[in-house]
Amino acid sequence: MDDQSRMLQTLAGVNLAGHSVQGGMALPPPPHGHEGADGDGRKQDIGDILHQIMTITDQSLDEAQAKKHALNCHRMKPALFSVLCEIKEKTGLSIRGAQEEDPPDPQLMRLDNMLLAEGVSGPEKGGGSAAAAAAAAASGGSSDNSIEHSDYRAKLTQIRQIYHTELEKYEQACNEFTTHVMNLLREQSRTRPISPKEIERMVGIIHRKFSSIQMQLKQSTCEAVMILRSRFLDARRKRRNFSKQATEILNEYFYSHLSNPYPSEEAKEELAKKCSITVSQVSNWFGNKRIRYKKNIGKFQEEANLYAAKTAVTAAHAVAAAVQNNQTNSPTTPNSGSSGSFNLPNSGDMFMNMQSLNGDSYQGSQVGANVQSQVDTLRHVINQTGGYSDGLGGNSLYSPHNLNANGGWQDATTPSSVTSPTEGPGSVHSDTSN
């Protein structure tokens, strides 16, 4: 009790600088030469107060409660409280000008909107899962896409669970700390003046401090969602090479229509069905193929010759089958009064730089040895099977198609059919009608 009395008297009569207080005004210290026993006593009292403050942390809970009870029951306690109110009234003027409420953080609002749009925060109503399903439907709903988007939904659900678990921990820690501070301030309000409004202001400060943790959590969650989207739903991820069969079909159409490699909408739909791809993918493939062909014609000439020889062999087999079928069905040899016509499949507008079917040369770049051997074999098969004379080489079955000087495609005349002229009963010549 004596210690508490001496503490209150010291706080009421002495400030921290050692100046005496009288009527709320600090008096100048006496000259150094006139300091007496009172000055030494004040220094000793201040030293005792500082020592008690430093030993507060070493006190037990029972000792702290006992000193608190003694302070509240002391007769000078109301005087001490009034002095503290005066001090707070003077120092509180600078605090009143401070802004009471801060505007919401725009970055935090953007993070909240993104998490809500992705279905991570708020009630689970699809969110990113619905986006994944829409992307799967747009890509054709193949099994690979379905598996990928099911994995996306599973990963998104996992991110959502982790986010909500960490958010609950954050809210629990924030509430516990806020409750502790509020109880502490209410307890201290018995000794020093603390208004309820000041307690609310302190709660707001605590929440703003904790909001940095919340922003970090939401930022990391948004980054995880963006990485997940770039891995599963990015358009560049959807780009895959076509199958070998689809590439063969598209290349065959391209080189067989090299004079005008712009398929119609009906042709695109037909090619899309054959290749099991979409019409837009067919359009993109032809656009890219035309650009690559124009940039490097020499490189693609060998490929064009390969497809030319391949399709020529197919056409020769069809001609041979048609001739054999005609000989089987018509026992008499056609004379000058009768003529038969045979339609070659894809005979018109077929290949670039191919001068003749059984001629001696190709125009354009040098044909490889394997292609030349196929041409020689083809010429031999046609001569042996159909009895064609060398007159076939005199006429050009495949017209060369060139690019314009400005890079455009130049159309060439398209042969329509191959007919047998009326010369003799023992020979059949080819003739192209434009």
UniProtKB/Swiss-Prot annotation:
Pfam families: Homeobox_KN (PF05920), PBC (PF03792)
Region called Disordered, residue ranges: 20-41, 326-349, 403-434
UniProt keyword Lyase, yes or no: no
Gene name in the database record: PBX3
Regions of compositional bias (Polar residues) in chain numbering: 403-422
Disulfide bonds: none
Subcellular location as annotated: Nucleus
Positions of region (PBC-B): 130-234
Low complexity: compositionally biased ranges: 326-341
Keywords: Activator, DNA-binding, Homeobox, Nucleus, Transcription, Transcription regulation
Organism: Homo sapiens
Subunit structure: Interacts with PBXIP1.
Protein name listed in UniProt: Pre-B-cell leukemia transcription factor 3
Tissue: Ubiquitously expressed.
Gene Ontology CC, one term: transcription regulator complex
GO molecular function: DNA-binding transcription activator activity, RNA polymerase II-specific; DNA-binding transcription factor activity, RNA polymerase II-specific; RNA polymerase II cis-regulatory region sequence-specific DNA binding
Family: Belongs to the TALE/PBX homeobox family.
Region (PBC-A): 48-127
DNA-binding region coordinates: 235-297
